[in-house]
Amino acid sequence: VIDFMIVGLPRSGTAWLANWFTTERSICWHEPLWQRSLAELDAMKGAGLFGIADTQLTLMNADELNRHPAKKMIVHRELGDVNFSLAKLGLPAMQDEHKWKLDEIGGYHITFHDLFHVERFRPAAEWLLPMPFDAARYSLLRGLNIQNALAIKEAQEAYIDYLEMQDE
């Protein structure tokens, strides 16, 4: 069963958070909804805590997501910053409705910028996972630009397919 979820728009630090929340006692899979359904992920069993960090969760109905028992961390990033980052990858912009949905999800709300300030991130991390905060590991990961190249490539290919269907 999924123990925790990280919800955010694309380019909002979900890959970085998946790395942070993968520890000796937990695993956080980034963008698993490209390959599996939520029901399939919930049926997975393993040792330790299991979490997902997936931008596609923002497409789900907020009420449905709120009914799921997993703890949720919701990451907010300015829509202009999200869209600027998406444009650099050749991907379409997100709409206002996607950002508003985040407000409807229950859980721990944090901004993208707060992820990179230890005094703001630490309470969120400790809330999501009941384990001691590793400040040395945080300092190391904080400086890394972590991106999921496979998810980016899949999104680009899906967008190209969509554009080609529009031309037919």
Regions inferred by a protein language model and the residue ranges of each:
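PAPS-dependent sulfotransferase catalytic core
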Residues: V1-F50, A135, S139-L144, A149-L150
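Short coil/turn segments at beta-strand junctions that form active-site/ligand-binding loops
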Residues: I2, A47-G48, H68-K71, G106, ...
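A sequence-composition feature that detects small, non-aromatic residues
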Residues: A15-A18, A39, A43, A47, ...
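PAPS-dependent sulfotransferase catalytic domain
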Residues: T55-D134
